[in-house]
Structures are given as structure tokens and as C-alpha cells.
Curated annotation (Swiss-Prot):
Compositionally biased tracts (Basic and acidic residues): 1-10
Region of interest: Disordered: 1-120
Catalytic activity: Release of N-terminal amino acids, preferentially methionine, from peptides and arylamides
Compartments where located: Cytoplasm
Keywords from the UniProt entry: Aminopeptidase, Cytoplasm, Hydrolase, Metal-binding, Protease
Lineage of source species: Eukaryota, Fungi, Dikarya, Ascomycota, Pezizomycotina
Protein name: Methionine aminopeptidase 2-2
InterPro entries attached to this UniProt entry: Creatinase/aminopeptidase-like (IPR036005), Met_Aminopeptidase_Type2 (IPR050247), Pept_M24 (IPR000994), Pept_M24_MAP (IPR001714), Pept_M24A_MAP2 (IPR002468), Pept_M24A_MAP2_BS (IPR018349), WH-like_DNA-bd_sf (IPR036388), WH_DNA-bd_sf (IPR036390)
Cofactor (UniProt): Co(2+); Zn(2+); Mn(2+); Fe(2+)
An annotated Gene Ontology molecular function: aminopeptidase activity
Keyword Iron-sulfur tagged: no
């Protein structure tokens, strides 16, 4: 989810291989490729399974000893010739192995063990059930200036991050991967309504996290990190379907940005991708994807925001795209930025512009960042559009002086159900809240709630976005949201 700069306040990359990095809380048994290696991570495939298969095919899995018959497999013969230790050759009937009729053991509840489970479509199996011990690690990228992570650095990281930090983030990332990959395969198709896509994504996140967010306090345990952004063409960011608005239907000529967040105990994973069905947009998507990967490459402890922004702009603006016979330069959008992420706050205090700038802020060890870029065939500058994307609570403002009863009641619901996490009108109505517009206006007028509008470039232009969340370890960065798709 892009952060507005102070001035303005089906193409996917393959993850690259990298050297192994020792993270703050090392999990050496876990795959670095996310859900793509889930079966191996959960132990579905292993040496024991190979032995059992061999035995079923008549293969002797024991090591031959002196004095024993050497019995190679002969699956199509009734007799085998064997040689004893004294040199005699004899013929024996091949013994037939009885087929095992053992049934798979079930749990007390009658279900198959967790190691036998697969994700469903639509995704409804809890990620915590699929990964009962540890969650997959993101892509680990060591810093160029270090060869190893010292024990002292590991102890320092352990003080920065509590014991739940990495498990929470990795669980949120795995939920994001599984839901978005389902969306890419089953939901995002020409003719689909944007409302059906948004609801499909959000239903998947709630199902895999195990928290529907309908009871007071449940939303704070896990769920959506912010409303699903579904932005078409010149709409770059912050658009989501609202209740009782006309359905928007996805067309095969559209360029769709999909941006959603997942949180577990307030640890928010923010990741986005762009989908286009017409290959004439390929260069636009490639430019933005490569710019995001460039930002990730340059990110790290002590990296300056100015240097990252300059590198992003250089890569993105080296591309041009031909659309319907006209050539457009790809421009880095200059008044929206990447950002750091704090607990229960999608936007922290630091920003990463996509252009060359004078921001001398540095990244620090233990921080979490959303590295994202937006590219456009238009002006490369965004304006607020009509409509509402969502709302965010201003924690610095008290509601003690509110006079309107509807505003007081609505604020109580917001504090109990969302806290500082951005929410949409659909989320309010899902809780059964009605007639809230007047109360919401009063909260906005008093500075207690901030309203977010869609951000657009000029009509007729096309915009694209790619984004990943990274964690800054001592010896390297973990691209926590990296997957096989991008």
C-alpha cells in the first residue's frame, strides 16, 4: 500500500537464487521458496516413503550380508537364480510379498494427519495446520559487505525482535502467497467483477488465518492488513469496491494492480502485483517489476533512501512501451513512496521515493520495509480522485469532545474492531454497522479519522505496481513475501 509523499500527502518475475543467510532466529529446516515446496517442508516426501515404495515393488532394502542370498528385484519373473557363498547355483521360487492393507492412521477427530493435508481451492485450510511446526522462510539475500552473521549480531537481533516476530511475519507471508496465487489462477479473469475478486481475496485471508474478525478483539489477532486495492489503468492506488456502487467488470484490455496486506498479531505483510492480459503492456510490467527488484537489491542496513530512489528511477525510466502504435516512456511516479512498516501501522515514519531525491534517512537493522514502485505512461504524478478507499484512525486525537451520538458510537466500533489498521466501508457493513456516513463525516471533520481517496494519473494512461515486504537482519535481508509468482 503506497504512502503519499510529503509533497502530495500476467507478468511476474521469478525469484532469483541467493546465498544462504543465517537469520536472526535461524530455521535451517525450512524451504526458502514459500508454498512451492510446502510438501517437502511438511515431510510428505522423505526417505521412509522411498523405502516403503521399494518394498512394495519387491526390492530388498536391507544391506546384503555374507551368508545371505543376493536378491535383486525381478518383478516380472516367477523364479530367480541365486548364488550361495560356496559357489553353488540354485533356483528358488520368488516369494511374493503380501500387500499391506494398513490404512492411514487418522487423528482423534477422524481427519487425516496434518502432514497429509493439501490446500483447497478456494483456500480454506488454516496455514497453521499446513505448517504445524515452522513457516517457510522468505528469500534470504546476504549483504555484499559481510560474509557471516556473528553470534553477537544474533543476540542483538533477538533483543530487537521478540520470539513471535519471525513466526508471525512468516505466517502472514505464507497466507499472502497462497491467497494471491489462488486469485491469479481462479479469480482474476476477464469478465469478473472487482467486487468478487476483492471478496475472494479477503475471504481467503480470513479463512487461512483462522480469524473472521467478527467478534470484538478477534481482528487484532490476524486478518487483513488493509483493504484490497484493485486499481485499473490510470488509477494507480487506493481503490476498492464499496457497497451499493455499480459493479466494475475486468476487461481483457485492462491493467490491474492488486495490492493487499495480511497481518498476524499486527505484523503486516504488504505485497502487490500487476496483471495484464494483453502482451502490449509487457514492457510496462517488466520496467516496474525490475525497478522493485532493484530497490530490494539496494536496500539494507545503512542504505540511504536517496540512493535507493535514484537506482529505482534509473532502471524504470530506461524502459519504454509501445501501445497501439504509439511509444511512451515509462515514468517513475514521483509523489507516492515505499515505506517502513510498524506493528499495526502500515505506514511508519520513513519513506522511499522512486526518484532521485535528497532524503538522507538511512535504513536500520531490525526494521521492516515495503519496497514498492509505481510506473506510468502518463505524467508520473498522482492526484486525489473522487470516492473513498478507506479510513484510518488517528491515534493522537481523542474523541472525548464529540457531541454527535452517532460519531461516538462509530468511534467505539472502530477502536474495538480495527484500531489503527486501515478499514473500508465493506468492513464496517460486514460487522452490521448501518447509517454511519454522518458519524464518519463528523469524525473526519474533527481529525479523529483520516479518509483515503483513490490516486490517479491522467485518463488514458496506464500504471503498474510491484511490491514486496523485507525484513532487515544483521547479515542480510529477508524478502519475506517472495514467491514463485513474483
Amino acid at each position: 500500500m503506497g504512502s503519499k509523499s510529503p509533497e502530495g500527502h500476467r507478468q511476474a518475475p521469478h525469484a532469483s537464487n541467493c546465498n544462504e543467510l543465517k537469520p536472526a532466529n535461524p530455521d535451517p529446516q525450512i524451504s526458502q521458496n514459500g508454498s512451492g515446496s510446502a510438501d517437502l517442508d511438511r515431510g510428505v516426501i522423505g526417505d521412509d516413503d522411498d523405502d516403503e515404495d521399494a518394498e512394495e515393488n519387491g526390492v530388498n532394502t536391507e544391506t546384503p550380508n555374507v551368508g545371505k542370498l543376493n536378491q535383486p528385484p525381478f518383478p516380472n519373473l516367477d523364479q530367480v537364480h541365486v548364488t550361495t557363498t560356496d559357489g553353488l547355483c540354485i533356483t528358488e521360487k520368488k516369494k511374493k510379498r503380501k500387500k499391506s492393507n494398513k490404512k492411514k492412521k487418522k487423528t482423534k477427530s477422524g481427519a487425516l494427519p496434518a502432514t497429509e493435508l493439501k490446500q483447497t481451492s478456494p483456500p480454506r485450510v488454516l496455514v497453521s495446520t499446513l505448517f504445524p511446526s515452522e513457516y517457510p522462510v522468505g528469500e534470504l539475500v546476504p549483504y555484499d559487505c559481510t560474509a557471516r552473521t556473528t553470534d553477537e549480531e544474533l543476540r542483538y537481533n533477538s533483543r530487537l525482535w521478540d520470539d513471535d516476530f519471525l513466526p508471525d511475519y512468516r505466517q502472514a507471508a505464507e497466507i499472502h502467497r497462497q491467497v494471491r496465487q489462488y486469485a491469479q489462477k481462479e479469480l482474476i479473469k476477464p469478465g469478473a467483477t472487482l467486487l468478487s475478486i476483492a471478496e475472494g481475496i479477503e475471504d481467503g485471508v480470513r479463512a487461512l488465518s483462522g480469524h473472521q474478525g467478527l467478534e470484538p478483539g478477534d481482528f487484532f489477532k490476524a486478518g487483513m492488513g488493509f483493504p484490497t486495492g484493485l486499481c485499473l489503468n490510470h488509477i494507480a492506488a487506493h481503490w476498492t469496491p464499496n457497497p451499493r456502487e455499480k459493479d466494475v467488470i475486468l476487461d481483457k484490455g485492462d491493467v490491474l494492480k492488486v495490492d493487499f496486506g495480511v497481518h498476524v498479531n499486527g505484523r503486516i505483510v504488504d505485497s502487490a502485483f500487476t496483471v495484464a492480459f494483453d502482451d502490449k503492456y509487457d514492457n510496462l510490467l517488466t520496467a516496474v517489476r525490475e525497478a522493485t527488484n532493484t530497490g530490494i537489491k539496494h536496500a539494507g542496513v545503512d542504505a540511504r533512501m536517496s540512493d535507493i530512489g535514484a537506482a529505482i528511477q534509473e532502471v524504470m525510466e530506461s524502459y519504454e512501451v509501445e501501445i497501439d502504435g504509439k511509444v511512451f516512456p515509462v515514468k517513475a511516479i514521483r509523489n507516492i513512496t515505499g515505506h517502513d512498516i510498524l506493528r499495526y501501522h502500515i505506514h511508519g515514519g520513513k519513506q522511499i521515493p522512486f526518484i532521485k531525491n535528497n532524503n538522507q534517512d538511512k535504513m536500520e537493522e531490525g526494521e521492516v520495509y515495503a519496497i514498492e514502485t509505481f510506473g506510468s505512461t502518463g505524467r508520473g504524478f498522482l492526484d486525489d480522485d473522487v470516492g473513498v478507499y478507506g479510513y484510518g484512525r488517528n491515534e493522537n486525537m481523542s474523541g472525548a469532545n464529540l457531541r454527535l451520538s452517532s460519531a461516538k458510537s462509530l468511534l467505539k466500533t472502530i477502536d474495538a474492531s480495527f484500531g489503527s489498521i486501515v478499514f473500508s466501508r465493506r468492513y464496517l457493513e460486514r460487522l452490521g454497522v448501518k447509517n454511519y456516513l454522518l458519524g464518519m463525516k463528523n469524525l473526519i471533520d474533527n481529525g479523529i479519522v483520516e479518509c483515503y481517496s483513490p490516486l490517479v494519473d491522467v485518463k488514458g494512461s496506464y500504471t503498474a505496481q510491484f511490491e514486496h515486504t523485507i525484513l532487515l537482519h544483521s547479515g542480510g535481508k529477508e524478502v519475506i513475501s517472495r514467491g514463485d509468482d513474483y
